[in-house]
Regions:
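Extracytoplasmic ligand/sensor domains, especially the bilobed periplasmic-binding protein
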Residues: 82-85, 164-269, 317-342
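Beta-alpha junction/loop-to-helix N-cap segments that form part of ligand/metal-binding clefts
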Residues: 84-87, 111-118, 130-203, 212, ...
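Bacterial lipoprotein signal-peptidase II cleavage site
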Residues: 37-45
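Short, small-residue-biased leader/transition segments that mark boundaries at the very start
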Residues: 1-5
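Extracellular/periplasmic ligand-binding modules, especially the Venus flytrap/periplasmic-binding
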Residues: 252-255, 299, 304, 354-411
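Extracellular/periplasmic periplasmic-binding protein-like sensory domains
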Residues: 309-384, 442, 450-454
């Protein structure tokens, strides 16, 4: 991806060892093995208490307005007490800001969808209890099943857009890109559940996408650099992935770092996800052996590729993109548990500190989630952390006196957001990608299935 490659800050930062720290990494797909791989017219209500001067959100300083402009998806009536089987924690004396949810319940990422959604709803349960957004609580409406299909994604967007002020989640990069023009017409800001490097640049996302975590391309670069520093003599590598935002973005980062380090790329296999052939992937490893390979595929296919290569007597180092790993790989009874714990396989995180990390944000997440579900899986971390930056955007919009969709969009274009330590603070709208990365080794003795080795 050109977006990733052109950023000179994406590589060359040495990853710090975590061998002496008891921190556990998470990988984004870790519940079960999955084979995945015209403008809307807003009705604006204004309550004018007194004439007030409100500074633009383009200014570093924003005064708190005495009158707040509202619009589509914002009501004076309180949020429901429960949506989607999860309490909203809404203050019944406050109004409600509604968010939309474009999820996958029946497609390749169906195993991920419920966990992501549960954590997002739990986040706002906590946030509402902590005061909400000024005189408003926040609630996520019932999710729409897109099946990870762009056309269904558009259908879902069309169905919910007149009822929400922003999107709590739009799962999938191609799917989100497919609706981006409509989002632009509607001033609809949204959180992606993907880590495409292009989300960091306004020329791609029109200033509408509230990204979080590191990007696939940066992770690919960091994976190569770390492997060369820690895994011995690596001279020949292979690159494997799905064509598109995920695999191609990762492949671009791996290729760039390989070139910079003088490595030979023996082969690159990046077909569309629907055309990925395990036999062909294993065949490349057999006919053109490599010292290490870097896959960005689904967890289900990853197990087949690693297992197929091992059956042929091949166990080169493998440094996986986060979605290629699954904690089921190291659970008791899984046939390839020994292979994944052999020291030949490693996996990147996705730029969010792991579940057991010692930050205020993680502590709040664990305390809240433990009241709802007994689990430490990665979907919860990804879902919860995805909402922090949106919360910051809504807070900025409210402070600026405009929580209409136009006001929310303006806030998203220029605001510094934080996450109680879960991620580094980020200034949105700056055409700059995050580079924080985690890398871990599969370990079945740990709840999340991986032990962190390094971060940067």
């Amino acid at each position: 991806s050109e977006m990733c490659i052109r950023d000179s800050n994406l590589r060359g930062r040495k990853m710090n060892s975590l061998r002496k720290r008891g921190i556990i990494i998470f990988s984004i797909l870790s519940l079960v093995i999955v084979a995945c791989g015209g403008a809307a017219e807003e009705e604006v209500v204004e309550e004018t208490v007194e004439e007030a001067v409100v500074e633009s959100l383009d200014s570093p300083a924003v005064t708190t307005a005495t009158a707040v402009k509202t619009g589509t998806g914002v009501t004076a009536e309180p949020c429901p007490a429960e949506i989607g089987g999860v309490p909203t924690g809404a203050d019944q004396n406050k109004g409600c800001i509604y968010l939309g949810l474009l999820n996958d319940y029946t497609g390749p990422y169906a195993p991920a969808g419920p966990g992501l959604e549960l954590a997002q709803r739990a986040f706002w349960l906590w946030a509402n209890g902590a005061g909400g957004i000024g005189e408003y609580s926040v609630a996520i409406r019932e999710g729409f099943d897109t099946g990870y299909n762009p056309q269904k994604h558009l259908e879902g967007y069309t169905a919910i857009k007149d009822e929400v002020a922003a999107l709590a989640m739009s799962l999938g990069t191609p799917q989100t890109l497919f609706i981006l023009d409509e989002m632009d017409k509607d001033n609809m800001v949204g959180v992606p559940m993907s880590w495409w490097s292009g989300w960091s640049y306004k020329e791609n996302d029109k200033g509408l996408i509230v990204e979080f975590g590191s990007q696939y391309c940066a992770d690919g670069m960091n994976a190569v650099d770390w492997s060369l520093e820690n895994l011995g003599d690596i001279k020949t590598v292979g690159i494997m992935g799905f064509a598109g935002d995920y695999g191609s973005d990762w492949a671009a980062g791996v290729a760039k770092a390989a070139e910079a380090n003088g490595l030979t790329v023996a082969w690159t296999y990046t077909p569309p996800s629907t055309e990925f052939d395990v036999a062909q992937a294993v065949g490349l490893m057999v006919t053109q052996p490599v010292d290490a390979y870097f896959p960005a595929i689904s967890a289900g296919l990853m197990a087949q590729v690693a297992g197929g290569a091992a059956q042929q007597g091949l166990t080169p180092f493998a440094i996986l993109a986060g979605p290629s790993f699954n904690d089921a790989f190291v659970q008791e009874g899984f046939p390839l548990k020994g292979l994944f714990e052999s020291g030949a396989i490693y996996a990147m995180g996705l730029g969010v500190a792991p579940y057991e990390a010692d930050t205020p944000g993680h502590a709040v997440m664990r305390a809240t989630m433990s009241q709802i579900v007994e689990s430490a899986n990665a979907f919860l971390v990804a879902g919860w952390s995805s909402q922090y930056h949106l919360k910051g955007v809504l807070e900025a919009a409210y402070k600026g006196g405009d929580i209409s969709r136009a006001g929310i969009r303006r806030a998203a274009a220029n605001v510094t957001v934080s996450s109680d330590g879960m991620m580094e603070p980020r200034e949105l709208g700056q055409d700059r990608a995050d580079t924080a990365a985690y890398i871990g080794i599969p370990d079945g003795s740990i709840g999340s299935g991986q032990r962190v080795l390094a971060f940067n």
